[in-house]
Amino acid sequence: DKRGTGQRQLRQAFKDKDVTLTEGTTLATKSVALRDLQALETLIFVKPEVLLEPGSYRCAYASAIADLQRTQAALLYDTWSRPNGFAAELINAASSTPAFFDEREAAGAYVNALVSTLEVIRLQKLDRPMGLTVSEARTSRLENWRSKRSTQNMVLNLLTLQRFFAVEGGFSDLLRRVDKQEDATAAEALFNKVIYNLQAFESPMETLVADTKARSNLESLLNDLRALQTLIQEKIAIDLGLVPGFNATDGD
């Protein structure tokens, strides 16, 4: 949200005390900026004492967002796991499904998911908040900076990608089957390195991005993330005869 549109909408909502934002059915029709996890974080971590006030508008609004997010999470899980859900379409891709023409298209989509998620972590969650210099660093550009979860979010993202890459029958196993073990080993080593280095930081990312002494470590982390993304996109994908598809982070 480079232009702060979401925060302006939230400020207006607080000013107007819009009751339609406190009911799940009407909240679901509103702008994403008024009902996403960023909005919930703002409600909880900006003036948290207000949440304790009886009949607090902020509390009712936060509860409505939480309920809506729970409903959306349940829908997402069901869409993935039901008998004819997305997981089943992926597993049966070799026989052609509505989602995938064949197993190669399915595998290509998952390479793309790995690459695009790594790019989001590198560019949006770290590089952009850091700026080109310490003086240009912007803490407010960090994901969940109010709750100081920025580092933990990146760790969880990377652990998920690592598990996805190394799962039995996944990309790591496939690389070994085509005699490309060195690339599998290199990717696993980079995953381990970036996760370890993130977890080793003693200060929150909200402090580190503006800390001159931490700059070199953060830049090394960026380089390792870039190396991992490049390895998967330009080497591993070719090893497996795959071509990453459309990347939503590319803009146009």
Can you describe what each PLM-predicted range is?
Residues 1-252:
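Mature extracytoplasmic or organellar-lumen-exposed domains after removal of signal/transit peptides
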